[in-house]
């Protein structure tokens, strides 16, 4: 079973993240005859989960007058208790904008460009009429069910969201007995709901901002602006409209077989004696190369300005590195930057192993407990959460790769619903990111969101499509 921490308080890392919602979709075949019983199962189970962990019914508030620091986050939990209600959305009626059957979507591999967040999600990515920490919407289509889970990113990272969904499945599966269940021991958060390593108030007694602010690596690992070139800021708080991307982006999904991944790893073996890269390092290097070629075609021939740099940013879960309990659902996310000249990344003459070993070296260097504690120290001592800016330009010379390979969605049992058939994110959910999905039947899928011209160029790249199948 997937236990959750008993209490929840916002951490230094939570406060560094932009205030927006993101959505996960879990897809199941469900006949129309079972809709009523399925709806009852879902609501009963979510109510049971909310009763078990009332902080899941809470809302996020930013305190601009806090004695801790300006913009300190507060979690308001309703008292008396308020239930967490599912939004049930019937998309099978004759007047519905939704036309696809579940079988139609299944036959085409459940492509994300057909999964419109405006129809399926209780909260569109980045835009909210609420500050709830999470919301759930159950969408019934002909022959199936698409459950949308929306989470506030200040509240939870991908691992934590997966943990909450997994605990929800425990309730659906009937394996949780609230009357006789014991709270998890040793989750490291006690009644304060936060591990000491992440507590803003404790960290401010250990670190000083002026001792840390001159180290660009600490800023990078927080994904905060350090180069002085990026003026983009997220809205101060939701509800707020995000800037419209011009030109707009489109989502595409690609699949890599286990044989394709093995061949990419073989291509990416470094020339240095004794050097080693993982399959993930090799895949990141491969994606970085071909994404930059799609955005900057002249990088193939090293014709970009020689001083133009590119970054690939890999999201790292720091729980193991910081010895934080797996029951902890808050953000424990670090951002590992590898930078190279863009001509080197895109060049036909650059060995893939030279890129992959750089990725491996920066990841290895980042997984240092002393370093990560200082990164959290910078996050805790920053004087104003509202003045921070973010460090990468993901639609330009940078690529952000986040891997959800370890999320348990395909392992979960949902009682009468069985196992999850598809895990997806809605169309354009993470603009400009490259998201690696949990593997299914030995196949790894990833979703990219790119400008349309760049996406077309990627799909026509013969070297890329030799290994990647477009969905």
From Swiss-Prot:
It comes from the Eukaryota. GO terms for molecular function: acyltransferase activity, transferring groups other than amino-acyl groups. The keyword Acyltransferase applies. Keywords: Acyltransferase, Transferase. Its EC number is 2.3.1.-. Disruption phenotype: Impairs the production of PR-toxin as well as of the intermediate eremofortin A, but accumulates eremofortin B. InterPro entries: CAT-like_dom_sf, Plant_Fungal_Acyltransferase, Tri101-like_N. Pathway: Sesquiterpene biosynthesis. Belongs to the fumigaclavine B O-acetyltransferase family. O-acetyltransferase; part of the gene cluster that mediates the biosynthesis of PR-toxin, a bicyclic sesquiterpene belonging to the eremophilane class and acting as a mycotoxin. The first step of the pathway is catalyzed by the aristolochene synthase which performs the cyclization of trans,trans-farnesyl diphosphate (FPP) to the bicyclic sesquiterpene aristolochene. Following the formation of aristolochene, the non-oxygenated aristolochene is converted to the trioxygenated intermediate eremofortin B, via 7-epi-neopetasone. Monomer. This is Eremophilane O-acetyltransferase ORF8. It comes from Penicillium roqueforti (strain FM164). The gene is ORF8.
């Amino acid at each position: 079973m997937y236990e959750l921490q008993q209490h929840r308080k916002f951490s230094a890392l939570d406060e560094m993240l932009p205030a927006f919602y993101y959505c996960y979709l879990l897809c199941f075949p469900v006949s129309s005859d079972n809709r009523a019983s399925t709806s009852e199962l879902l609501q009963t189970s979510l109510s049971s989960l909310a009763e078990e962990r009332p902080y899941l019914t809470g809302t996020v508030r930013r305190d601009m007058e806090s004695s801790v620091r300006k913009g300190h986050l507060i979690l308001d939990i309703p008292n008396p208790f308020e239930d967490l209600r599912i939004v049930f959305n019937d998309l099978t009626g004759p007047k519905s904008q939704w036309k696809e059957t579940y079988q139609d979507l299944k036959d085409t591999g459940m492509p994300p460009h057909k999964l419109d967040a405006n129809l399926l999600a209780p909260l569109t990515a980045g835009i909210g009429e609420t500050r709830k920490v999470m919301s759930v919407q159950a969408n019934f289509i002909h022959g199936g069910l698409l459950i949308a889970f929306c989470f506030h990113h200040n509240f939870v990272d991908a691992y934590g969201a997966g943990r909450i969904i997994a605990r929800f499945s425990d309730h659906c599966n009937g394996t949780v007995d609230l009357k006789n269940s014991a709270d998890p021991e040793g989750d490291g958060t006690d009644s304060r709901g936060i591990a000491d390593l992440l507590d803003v108030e404790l960290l401010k007694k250990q670190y000083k901002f002026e001792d840390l602010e001159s180290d660009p690596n600490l800023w990078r690992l927080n994904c905060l602006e350090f180069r002085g070139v990026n003026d983009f800021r997220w809205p101060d708080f939701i509800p707020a409209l995000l800037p419209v991307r011009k030109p707009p982006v489109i989502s595409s999904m690609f699949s890599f077989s286990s044989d394709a991944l093995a061949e990419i790893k073989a291509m990416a073996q470094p020339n240095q004696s004794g050097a080693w890269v993982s399959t993930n390092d090799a895949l990141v290097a491969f994606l970085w190369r071909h994404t930059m070629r799609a955005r900057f075609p002249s990088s193939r021939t090293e014709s970009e300005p020689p001083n133009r740099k590119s970054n690939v940013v890999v999201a790292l879960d720091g729980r193991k590195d910081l010895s934080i309990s797996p029951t902890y659902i808050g953000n424990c996310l670090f951002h590992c930057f590898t930078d190279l000249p863009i001509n080197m990344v895109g060049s036909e003459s650059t060995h893939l192993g030279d890129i992959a070993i750089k990725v491996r070296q920066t990841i290895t260097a980042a997984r240092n407990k002393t370093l990560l504690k200082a990164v959290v120290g910078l996050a805790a001592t920053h004087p104003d959460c509202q003045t921070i800016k973010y460090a990468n330009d993901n639609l330009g010379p940078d690529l952000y790769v986040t891997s959800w390979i370890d999320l348990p969605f395909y392992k979960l049992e949902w009682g009468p619903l069985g196992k999850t058939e598809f895990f997806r994110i809605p169309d354009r959910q993470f603009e400009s990111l490259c998201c690696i999905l949990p593997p299914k039947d030995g196949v790894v899928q990833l979703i990219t969101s790119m400008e349309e011209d760049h996406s077309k160029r990627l799909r026509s790249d013969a070297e890329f499509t030799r290994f990647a199948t477009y969905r």
